[in-house]
């Protein structure tokens, strides 16, 4: 009886520790990391992107040049949104399932590729474009 009670406490401790680690790793917003500085001023437009099981919806978006906001809403797991080719250094949105993350960004005219940088997600189709005019 005493031995079973001890095992329960050990199991509870392991589960509690694992929950803490997973929660810390998969927390809500990524906030763009420490190297990214958001532009000041109001956003002209908010580009909303839903990240799901290996997809972005919409796959492509249009935005005006200047300060815009990008919002990632995640469903079905942890997802990120970064710009390919280092075009926006340090910018990173990260959201766990059912959560969202949002940052402002100052984009010049052009076509930007975005993708999820979680291993295997981009290769499985989690890539899109933002066209700025």
How would you label these PLM feature ranges?
Residues 80-84:
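Beta-strand signatures of extracellular beta-sandwich domains
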Residues 87-93:
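Surface-exposed loop/edge segments in extracytoplasmic proteins
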Residues 1-24:
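Sec-dependent bacterial lipoprotein signal peptides
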Residues 51-53, 60, 85-87, 99:
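Short, well-ordered turn and helix-capping elements at secondary-structure junctions
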Residues 54, 79:
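Glycine-centered loop/turn positions within well-structured domains
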Residues 59-77, 101-113:
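Beta-strand cores of secreted/periplasmic/IMS beta-sandwich domains, seen most often
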Residues 23-35, 41, 48, 55, ...:
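Extracellular/periplasmic metallocenter environments
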Residues 49-50, 72:
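Well-ordered beta-strand segments characteristic of repetitive beta-sheet solenoids
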